[in-house]
Amino acid sequence: MGKVYDWFEERLEIQAIADDITSKYVPPHVNIFYCLGGITLTCFLVQVATGFAMTFYYRPTVTEAFSSVQYIMTEVNFGWLVRSVHRWSASMMVLMMILHVFRVYLTGGFKNPRELTWITGVILAVLTVSFGVTGYSLPWDQIGYWAVKIVTGVPEAIPVIGSPLVELLRGSVSVGQSTLTRFYSLHTFVLPLLTAVFMLMHFLMIRKQGISGPL
């Protein structure tokens, strides 16, 4: 085992990386509320794992979406548990994100020189809400359908570009298969990719600048 470790150590300098991680200074004022961002990340990872598991059975069509969700809940081994954990962790992620934003704001963590960290955090908050909006529609039940119809109809109030925006979101003039396909693609590919990128940026900046001091 020692030879294997030495082989990797010689090439990757594992010990230096470990020392850098474990020796990072943590200010004495840090308390449990500073863990809210990490909890949000944990919820996101749970979302990725459970969401990926459900893609094996979910069918993103207006005729089969609801029945495929029913199949996951009633026929797939532990499917009910996977989907329930996905829903619970989604709610928890939104809650932890909101509390994290409040904590950062109230402790002044957005001030110089951490403005860019705050901006990436706000973008992540928008992405988190977008996850909720797109995921809510995927079962394609009555609640999901009408929620999509209302949400995608909001931009119509914008002068000049309102109607084109609505059509862009829906994929057509009315809510249908194109809308579900768009929301499924956003929920399972575009949003997770963007979230991973901005999370990496967010954590790298936190790592570089450290935790903000007390007010």
Curated annotation (Swiss-Prot):
Keywords: Chloroplast, Electron transport, Heme, Iron, Membrane, Metal-binding, Photosynthesis, Plastid, Thylakoid, Transmembrane, Transmembrane helix, Transport
Membrane topology term: Multi-pass membrane protein
Cofactor: heme b; heme c
A Pfam family recorded for this sequence: Cytochrome_B
Additional facts recorded: Heme 1 (or BH or b566) is high-potential and absorbs at about 566 nm, and heme 2 (or BL or b562) is low-potential and absorbs at about 562 nm.
Alphabetized HAMAP family for the sequence: Cytb6_f_cytb6
Protein name per the record: Cytochrome b6
Organism whose genome encodes this protein: Psilotum nudum (Whisk fern)
